Amino acid sequence: MEKGRWSSEDAPRASMPDELSHPKFSEWKFKLFRVRSMEKAPVQNETPVEKENQPELAMEKTSSQGSVMRLCFGGKSKENVESARGRVDLKLQEIDTHMNLLKNMCRLCGIAIQKAKGPSHEVQGVLEESSRCALRRMGCKLVTWPEVILKVFKVDVTTDMETVHPSLFCHRCWTAAIRGGGFCSFTNTRIPDWKPHTSQCNLCFPKKSSFQRVGRKRTKPLKSAHILPKRFRRDSSESSRVWRQTTENPDGKEWLKLSVQRGQWVKNITRCQRDHLSTKLIPTEVPADLIRAVTCQVCDHLLSDPVQSPCRHLFCRLCIIRYTHALGPNCPTCNQHLNPSHLIKPAKFFLATLSSLPLLCPSEECSDWVRLDSFREHCLNHYREKESQEEQTPSEQNLDGYLPVNKGGRPRQHLLSLTRRAQKHRLRDLKNQVKTFAEKEEGGDVKSVCLTLFLLALRAGNEHKQADELEAMMQGRGFGLHPAVCLAIRVNTFLSCSQYHKMYRTVKATSGRQIFQPLHTLRNAEKELLPGFHQFEWQPALKNVSTSWDVGIIDGLSGWTVSVDDVPADTISRRFRYDVALVSALKDLEEDIMEGLRERALDDSMCTSGFTVVVKESCDGMGDVSEKHGSGPAVPEKAVRFSFTIMSISIRLEGEDDGITIFQEQKPNSELSCRPLCLMFVDESDHETLTAILGPVVAERKAMMESRLIISVGGLLRSFRFFFRGTGYDEKMVREMEGLEASGSTYICTLCDSTRAEASQNMVLHSITRSHDENLERYEIWRKNPFSESADELRDRVKGVSAKPFMETQPTLDALHCDIGNATEFYKIFQDEIGEVYQKPNPSREERRRWRSTLDKQLRKKMKLKPVMRMNGNYARRLMTREAVEAVCELVPSEERREALLKLMDLYLQMKPVWRSTCPSRDCPDQLCQYSYNSQQFADLLSSMFKYRYDGKITNYLHKTLAHVPEIVERDGSIGAWASEGNESGNKLFRRFRKMNARQSKTFELEDILKHHWLYTSKYLQKFMEAHKNSVKAMQATFNPEETPEEADNSLDVPDF
């Protein structure tokens, strides 16, 4: 290859996109040169070339008025060719001179290339090997100069035009780019503002005076390849506006012929002299019509990779692409509009004729006639025969396809190139017609009419990609994601506002499209999902509750009547009003409600009343949540969360006794369905503060049970009644709310009045006797002591009630804490069996520590269970398995004890599904039927083989497991569905929201956590997250590359564990 030539793969502009008709063409607003028509004298002498073009001249007369650009490419008309000397328009020579001046200038700093010592470099080229290696060592992986220039000098050179911008940059700018490592520039390079050539061009006609200072040398004129002749001056004496020259060509240069001038101009744009074959190689015997048919209408060379325009003219693919990009999308022959995407391959017969065309071999030693399709191989054989020192091969003549090059040129004076004022003037009549049509047919919607016209025009032009984009925008879809989708992604990936905004800007800058929505649109979407947006009404109105519906996050202490003697509350609390939160949750389930009505074949318009909503309430303390940051008052570093879950929605039709369930929560123990209501920094053992905060919640709850909610669902007003079931509490919280003594009390159970001794003697036969109303009556007896009894007698009468119950709880068993409590008990049994406590009644503390260490090592070895300080849900699930007890039995010496342990675990594993299952009658009917028998067998085994441990004592949860599970399942249908597991999982979300995207202030962070947690549980957003699950995982890995340690499951406080 010759030096300086490019192959099709290595071409400097190979990365230019195929869509040369840029959609922002109208924004560029190129200023076109104004060309005035010229009257010239008739032609006296015609050259043979001009005579050959007589048919073209006749054809031109029938077409539109010729332009200067048509003159460039051989189009002749009376207005353009009338001079005896065949001179062309002077403006063409001015542009040619302007382009030659640009070739000597630096694109980046504007200085002359000769002033910067060192080689020049192609702006649109690829990196040389030395430059690429130098930048690669500094971490830059770019491969083309346009990318490096954009990165270093912040200049986009991919849209440069040859008639406006220089194509080279100097060695100084190259040095600056290399020193900056391809990322930045350490020199302050001022980028010139390159403008198209005009009559006042500063480059061609510099305004600088000839003398810079008195007494100095005259400045040297700018070097140029062409010396401009004298400027024309206009003679306005005649109305024909003839152009005359002031001197008779003083330089002695003769005017170039029109065809020669045209050829020079084309060479500057197509640059295909070395790549395309001349038509002179065709034998003279070939008819002239055939030669014209196989000749490119742009470069006058033999067709290379021929394409055909819709107007039936033939061009080289590379030449027509460069031509349209430089001078506008017009056909060089007929001046019709030409879209490069509409170019097609000619007919196969024509291509076969072109391939079989005989050509004369250009080699002097050879005079063979060679077919065009084998011409390249024939020439290669000649070059291989020459053994030259220079490695020059004929692959210079790229006879394959050619890559488009971003060459410039002044565009045709098109509608898009006009100013806004000129566009309005030109389209005034059309605008009036469209407006009249829109008012008559489309109700005055001019925008829709114009967009539809544009859409139809794109479809007619086969530009379906752009048409699809326009149609998506018209339908409101567009490229960008819906604000609700962006909100769902932000909430579920735990992004703070600043993190999301950074992602939004990065994606927008990288892709050039606004895929993600800005933060203000997300805030608008939030308002519809948060409580306080939807209107509603209560009939009758709620007692002691405001009738306003637009209530957001409020202070948790609002509604607390403060007396003079009260001290300020040592807590911070934020909550939603209970009724407002329930309304927002129902509106979030609106689609599910309507879908349930359709599935049950119920008439939507008839179902406006009789709806019943069952709500599960949960409350739990989170323990220590201390943070190092946070301004505000000193508050306890413990927190309590109160939440609710809509379990089911049913409707009772008129005349029907049974209700029809139209919505059933499929995941009642998921954190996605457990909605937060109240957050507070308070110790759950602080009865007074907890009562003060939850008191207003209890009042709102009581008022709602006596009223009906009227709300619009599915476009119709419908009435709902609410039933609340407080089941998501652990035993500690139940005792706190029902006013019972602590869990170490003699009265072991929160469901019956049994003492610990009674429960150990009779482990199975007990029934539920406690209730909220009974506890209130017993509190009054405890407070008043009407029978004047002693303390022990009074305590025995009230069965462990020692404080006023302030919230009604459902007498039930919490499945999660039952698992944790029973696993803790089994862990202690395993220790005792390893140490053979049945033979040693009073072991020392050191012995117990040794047994525990042995058990931990065995569980770590066999079950991969790491020791924990407090029993949690995950550990309990792994411990209560057949594999775990078999591993423990390896450490038990006695065969009889091993069999007893295995039987004990087998019985437990048969009973466990009954209280863990969401619907035991469906999921495990056999275990449900055998539960009473299994529990009796379990109790007998404890009383006999493990009497050393259960002689006069038993744990609280073990008593409930053996005595009360069948009764609860018979009454409620399930225990597992009403567990507190969802609230416990929500505790982990509290910590994560607090760490990731909450303001670092105790006063405001509760509001942020409450808001984000509510959005996290939105069913509406969860549907979007299902569709975008994979993108969310990728984004979460991008913004949170370091995995945060999993929060431990909330534990049951077992002091001796």
UniProtKB/Swiss-Prot annotation:
The RING-type zinc finger mediates the E3 ubiquitin-protein ligase activity. PROSITE patterns: NBD (PS51487), ZF_RAG1 (PS51765), ZF_RING_1 (PS00518), ZF_RING_2 (PS50089). Its EC number is 3.1.-.-, 2.3.2.27. Belongs to the RAG1 family. Keywords: Chromatin regulator, DNA recombination, DNA-binding, Endonuclease, Hydrolase, Metal-binding, Multifunctional enzyme, Nuclease, Nucleus, Transferase, Ubl conjugation pathway, Zinc, Zinc-finger. It is found in: Nucleus. Residues 1-12 have a biased composition (Basic and acidic residues). This is V(D)J recombination-activating protein 1. In the adult, predominantly expressed in the thymus with lower levels in the pronephros, mesonephros and ovary. It comes from the Eukaryota. Catalytic component of the RAG complex, a multiprotein complex that mediates the DNA cleavage phase during V(D)J recombination. V(D)J recombination assembles a diverse repertoire of immunoglobulin and T-cell receptor genes in developing B and T lymphocytes through rearrangement of different V (variable), in some cases D (diversity), and J (joining) gene segments. In the RAG complex, RAG1 mediates the DNA-binding to the conserved recombination signal sequences (RSS) and catalyzes the DNA cleavage activities by introducing a double-strand break between the RSS and the adjacent coding segment. It comes from Danio rerio. Residues 408-475 bind DNA. Zn(2+) 3 binds at C311, H313, C331, C334. SUPFAM superfamilies: RING/U-box (SSF57850). Binds 1 divalent metal cation per subunit. Mg(2+) or Mn(2+). CDD domains: RING-HC_RAG1 (cd16530). It catalyses: S-ubiquitinyl-[E2 ubiquitin-conjugating enzyme]-L-cysteine + [acceptor protein]-L-lysine = [E2 ubiquitin-conjugating enzyme]-L-cysteine + N(6)-ubiquitinyl-[acceptor protein]-L-lysine. A divalent metal cation binds at D620, D730, E984.
